[in-house]
Amino acid sequence: MSNKVARRLGKCLFVSGRRFESRQSILQLRTETLTDTPLSATLDQSQFSMFKAAEIVNAAAACAEAECIEQLKKTDVVPLLMNYLLGEEQILVADPTAVAAKLRKMVVGGAGKTVVISDFDYTLSRFANEQGERLSTTHGVFDDNVMRLKPELGQKFVDLKNKYYPIEFSPNLTMEEKIPHMEKWWGTSHSLIVNEKFSKNTIEDFVRQSRIVFKDGAEDFIEALDAHNIPLVIFSAGIGNIIEYFLQQKLGAIPRNTHFISNMILFDEDDNACAFSEPLIHTFCKNSSVIQKETSFFHDIAGRVNVILLGDSMGDIHMDVGVERDGPTLKVGYYNGSLDDTAALQHYEEVYDIVLIHDPTLNVAQKIVDIINSSH
């Protein structure tokens, strides 16, 4: 890691709404602890000794809306989570005060007011394996398997990626300039799949042999959301069938709280691919414009005013747009790029509330859900 990034990741502490530059400056607060909080099992025990209960409650009361104060007095675990976030070198929080305010509202609202909207590729799935080798996306499942079975067709998928991938991430093009290229890339790729008439069984087998890997803790995270009846909306510009088959193979079944907004392969009566769902969803149109208003999605998230958004690209930051609500959106972004690209890293800090650098886990998302559940 560069020194510049390391300096920006300084180990600050967040206690009672204030930011401390070193652990020494809060030693005077070590009079009472919060060891009865449900998060005690997941946070370092030494952190609990750094908090004065009265200080935390008073700060929470000052910042919270009047009707929330009594609930916050019972337990306020937000400072504990903030201290964890700000103490980890691989986590960036540009505006701790704003993040703490969003977390407090979510804690008060509880699980019944929460919905998780998440990307899949490189968000719920890992970007690289332990050896640093890049893993597959849902579209990449076809790239890998078709190249093995039908090299000529496989090369067409590779050629498309080589042509359009640099355009997708070009810093010299606006999003509006990129969109026609993304539509062409996705449309051509989908046509290749349909024209080959891949069977459902073949695609399921592709998934079994794929290089898609869950992030560490992903299975527990998804199961925890289901257990607490928190809807999980997987919003992907990839191929939704691949995600469904992957979840079925890893979890045994699709959890009842899980919804998919993605490009779905349609099959004919012989279970062969015959078309893709409309409208086409690419990287830069992941918002309400591609959601059918009559779907169960809108019914199931009615009243879910607090959104936890998980993504890994600029195209993911608007996944909550169009969802009717008046609560906060906490945006958590996975940064998989180079640490030397400080401009890109800074951009992530500007659009995501919390930035996780090269994080192969869902630990932060799990901790957020834990504190929401712990207060009710």
Curated annotation (Swiss-Prot):
It is found in: Cytoplasm. GO terms for molecular function: 5'-nucleotidase activity; magnesium ion binding; nucleotide binding. GO terms for cellular component: cytoplasm. It is an enzyme of class 3 (hydrolase). Belongs to the pyrimidine 5'-nucleotidase family. This is Putative cytosolic 5'-nucleotidase 3. The lineage of its organism: Eukaryota, Metazoa, Ecdysozoa, Nematoda, Chromadorea. Its main location: cytoplasm. It comes from the Eukaryota. Mg(2+) binds at residues 119, 121, 312.
